[in-house]
């Protein structure tokens, strides 16, 4: 299950919440720009 974040009110959304409205809109404020939240990953770089 992917997590999304609204570009205006910054509330986190699930896939199920996005499917409730037609199109891609925030169910809270109606804003149409949604960002996908990625898990924080750590990249280990070997020192020279």
Swiss-Prot record:
Q: What class of enzyme is it?
A: transferase
Q: What is its EC number?
A: 2.7.7.6
Give the cofactors, semicolon-separated. Zn(2+)
Q: Which GO annotations describe the biological process of this protein?
A: DNA-templated transcription
Which reaction does this enzyme catalyse, per its entry?
A: RNA(n) + a ribonucleoside 5'-triphosphate = RNA(n+1) + diphosphate
* TM annotation in the entry: none
InterPro entries according to UniProt: RNAP_P/RPABC4, RPABC4/Spt4, Rpo12
What this protein is called in its record is DNA-directed RNA polymerase subunit Rpo12
Identify the coding gene.
rpo12
């Amino acid at each position: 299950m992917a997590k999304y974040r609204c570009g205006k009110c910054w509330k986190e959304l699930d896939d199920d919440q996005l499917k409730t409205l037609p199109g891609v809109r925030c169910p809270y404020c109606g804003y149409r720009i949604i960002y996908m939240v990625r898990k924080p990953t750590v990249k280990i770089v070997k020192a020279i």
